[in-house]
């Protein structure tokens, strides 16, 4: 036949299709192979069993004549109606446009397109005839894959069988002399033939469990040998089945070594999850990596694909154990906990992209909940056909090219009824205040919450996020920077809320044993007070107040309706240079979650909360301020008096109700601000005037003053003895803290210089290290919740009545009902300091003493003496009598020095001062102190350069030259 006459169409449905063009021998669509190329052994390998069953029926003995005719004329493969199967059906002779370039509009109609296509295929057929190529390359695949007994050339090759082999079917044996036409599959790996693993969904491969497959030892070893990149390796079908098999074994067979009963850990967790009606199964990464270390590493480095398999397995396991649970939840989510590697937000780099990370911080902003497309269907606006479903994820965007029915290119509208959505929310996670390096701004990272993780955290809460660090395209960044920049986000897989907010500071068993041992010391309260800022001399009242504030009282919630705060607020008011700011800095370094700010540097919204418009969603969002960030911690405000009145009023609610109500831009909500407030302020004019009341010395209103539990007044009084001790303390501190390399021969030992507090501890071994003090406070707040007895309330009521009576006569700070609660909070804090479960009489007396010291210090100088005399029985409780006797002795020394100055003139010729012991005894008896021998042998007496002369009955004190 001439080439010009060879116009037979390639499709059997075309007119003029001739059966004579069907080849006698065909194999696969990739080329023609003579059946003789297959060896007998190869044929026996593949279909030997089938031939054994069929051969006796091929040529039956009774029909020998018919068989002879068929042997002579050949078998008629086509009956009279075979052409009906290939009749022309134009409505089905259409092809999808997926993957085609649709940028060029084709103006031809369907008939013209099909005519041109037939002409092109006829030309290809003519070329095949000229070149001697296989004339059967365009035959339908259904004709190639027929397993007939008469014509072995239509048998499906083994490599095509491998793709569709059921997982439970054993591997077909293969002889050593297989031909080229039957390439076997390598152990444990499927060959990519007609369909790849990504083209055929795993759930459709078999009616049984799609992840059930048999892997021998060699197969498992091959699975662990990663070929190519890890992300491509874990997407292979055989690797996914291997991961699924191992994870299913882990879920059903893992036994926690700590479980004495030996029950299956995750079967129990699945039952608890179902009982709680949840859809998230938490997998401990440390347990998983102990059983399957390689797969656990794959999970950390390529989490997207591995978690997808794990969630499918978890869903099957849960639904197998609980048949009806699929009616409640359609999907089970796998949450990875205890990821061992913890990264700071500022240390995340591009190497972490598309890996699983664990970060922590404070939630500063939270968006609303949005519906995100998960499984979308479209309606063709021209023919009404429903297209889809299309699966949408965070990495790809679904675009429909054309309608397969009418070939229209749109427009397409989302079918709202059949489209499936999922919840979507965005958080802004900022570094915790305590870990930000000095002089640096805190970094932040966007966190995406999906499905049941919605609303798991609110602004101000400290959380840990385990998720996938990924990137997304942000057009605004490209416009801003002028070159392609991708925004990075963390897709949360697991969110752990730090309920106690102290979990960042881990306590070992040795630490707990040492803390319990310290708590048995009857002087532990005094030791803790001494350990507060030991580099600052004196100020025992401030140190006591700060210690009580750091331990805190017990929060109360009356029947879930009325909440009483347990945090203690402290105000430090005093002259400049009295170490107020240094106290705040010490608390910032010692407290677990302390936020430091200044009155001038913080506005009202900077302290409470601000409302911002989200640049992406264009909706208003809340961003917490300093008080919100310090939730369950301490907020330190320096220069409190420099704040504007409007800014100061904004923290009234935060200090008492410990919440911040917001009604801005249509947002009406409340944020948590459960923190202690320790503020420092300077008096009016720079110096505190004792002839004026407290309110006259500071620009603060009564509502804000009454919210402070303790008011500490610090006055810079000229006292030769106190000044001398202070100067000596400062000089010794500097001498012991010389920089490295200076005066090497005079330097102190290394163990002293490495720790700034070592010098102070050398002078006083009772001082605890800052690290141990942190651990002690953490342990106390986690494990001790003291309760108060009814008997103690009577004494508190009596003291309150007396204070109310005295405050009505004076002009100091008025006593209100809040001060009763202050006494209770401080007594609970003192009990917690001693790790006691109940408040004792000792704790109540200490709280009353601190409150009285605070109240009396705010009065005028003339009123203070009368109040000290009236409340002496409360104020002398648990006071260090050595300190009191030292104060009395110094007063006597000053009186003698003043007398000598009047009588003899200038005192430069005096070398020492002598005080009679009898005078000191008389002074001590006024305070009900009768035994002076412990004082004479104490360090207070000796360190202040006092010498006792028992023979003469005098106390000698040398004067500085």
From Swiss-Prot:
InterPro entries, per the entry: MCM, MCM2, MCM_CS, MCM_dom, MCM_lid, MCM_N, MCM_OB, NA-bd_OB-fold
Keyword vocabulary terms for this entry: ATP-binding, Cell cycle, DNA replication, DNA-binding, Helicase, Hydrolase, Metal-binding, Nucleotide-binding, Nucleus, Zinc, Zinc-finger
Annotated PANTHER family: DNA REPLICATION LICENSING FACTOR MCM FAMILY MEMBER, DNA REPLICATION LICENSING FACTOR MCM2
Record bears the keyword Zinc: yes
Short motif Arginine finger, span: 706-709
SMART domains on file: MCM
Reaction equation(s) it catalyzes: ATP + H2O = ADP + phosphate + H(+)
Residue stretches making up the MCM domain: 524-730
Biased composition (Basic and acidic residues): 120-146, 166-176
Official protein name in the record: DNA replication licensing factor MCM2
Major place of residence: nucleus
Family: Belongs to the MCM family.
Purpose of the protein: Probable component of the MCM2-7 complex (MCM complex) that may function as a DNA helicase and which is essential to undergo a single round of replication initiation and elongation per cell cycle in eukaryotic cells.
Spans annotated as Disordered: 1-81, 120-220
Domain of life: Eukaryota
Residues given in the record as ATP binding sites: 574-581
Biased amino acid composition, Polar residues: 1-17
A GO MF label: zinc ion binding
